Design a protein with these regions (language model features):
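Non-catalytic accessory segments of hydrolases
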Residues: 2, 23-210, 231
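Mature extracellular catalytic domain of secreted serine hydrolases
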Residues: 47, 100-121, 196-205, 215, ...
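Alpha/beta-hydrolase active-site loop
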Residues: 202-225
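Alpha/beta-hydrolase fold nucleophile elbow
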Residues: 227-239
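Positively charged n-region of N-terminal signal peptides that target proteins for export
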Residues: 1-7
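Cleavable N-terminal signal peptides of Sec/SRP-targeted secreted and luminal proteins
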Residues: 7-23
């Protein structure tokens, strides 16, 4: 929910790429209460909470309230996957489908991560219930706007969807920006015999965070037209580890056809020495 700052400019390295539901939670029957923020230029100040029955947009995840700040519309904390807890931990994400669900803003919904890069209990923050996304769009009624799908950085061990406020990008370039969370650290990228030897199919992967992004992209393809976006013009973009994940999505068969262009900002690839490659085979 916290919007930290406007991003002012991008240095882009552009890669052009031309390019697959279960679970219904308990329905919420009481009117939802929403937190409201006042636009103060480069930040948003909390101004209280109220119950509001206004403009809602229907999605496969439920009904989400349209909120307005100066020059933009925004929708926050939309669940695109069931919480990856219990039997869903270290497995491919499962889509959240509940059309009668009223989506409430959810505080502190960034994915579980280390603070300061040290594995100590006192430095842990976040929640495993974190697979949510935000949408920013220009104010006014328009259709078929280009969609930009943001992937945050942080070494795939830290970061969250709320770090950048894309209001200026949305207003200046007339685009829609979608920013999801994805699982991080050992909950998102983890290789262990208990996973590889006893799971089957896509659950055998070690890249659960990448699969979260794939599912978020599927959600965008199915729902973004309701927000004025063009599902046939989706650009994925990310910085640092987010740029690395962009490159991963370019070669992931599960992501084929889900986006049309890609921007990797300070992205990177990794390679192993021949000696280590032989070790992994043995």
């Amino acid at each position: 929910m916290n919007l930290l700052r406007n991003i002012k400019s991008f240095k882009l390295i552009i890669v052009i790429f031309c390019g697959t539901v279960v679970g219904v939670p308990e329905e919420i029957t009481n009117p939802p209460t929403y937190d409201y923020y006042q636009d103060k230029g480069d930040s948003f100040n909390y101004i209280g909470a109220k119950t509001y029955k206004g403009d809602f947009i229907q999605t496969t995840s439920g009904k989400v309230l349209s909120q307005r700040a100066e020059g933009i519309l925004y929708w926050e904390d939309i669940p695109f996957a069931l919480p990856p807890l219990g039997n869903l931990r270290w497995k491919a994400p499962v889509a959240f489908v509940a059309e009668d669900f009223h989506i409430n803003p959810k505080e502190n919904n960034f994915c579980h991560q280390e603070i300061g890069g040290q594995i100590q209990e006192i430095n842990q923050a976040g929640s495993e219930d974190c697979l949510y996304l935000d949408i920013r769009a220009p104010h006014g009624s328009r259709d078929n706007l280009p969609v930009m799908f943001w992937i945050h950085g942080g070494g795939n061990t830290s970061g969250h969807k709320d770090f950048y406020n894309f209001s200026e990008l949305v207003k200046r370039k007339d685009v829609i920006v979608v920013s999801p969370n994805y699982r991080l650290g050992p909950l998102g990228f983890f290789t262990h015999p208990a996973i590889q030897d006893y799971h089957s199919g896509i659950d055998k992967t070690s890249n659960f965070g990448i699969l979260d992004l794939v599912l978020a992209l599927k959600w965008v393809n199915e729902n973004i037209a309701s927000f004025g976006g063009d599902p046939n013009n989706i650009t994925i973009f990310g910085e640092s580890a987010g740029g690395h994940n962009v490159l991963s999505l370019l070669v992931a068969k599960q992501a084929k056809g889900l986006f049309h262009k890609a921007i990797s900002q300070s992205g990177y690839t990794k390679s192993s020495s021949l000696q280590n490659a032989y070790k992994s085979e043995n």
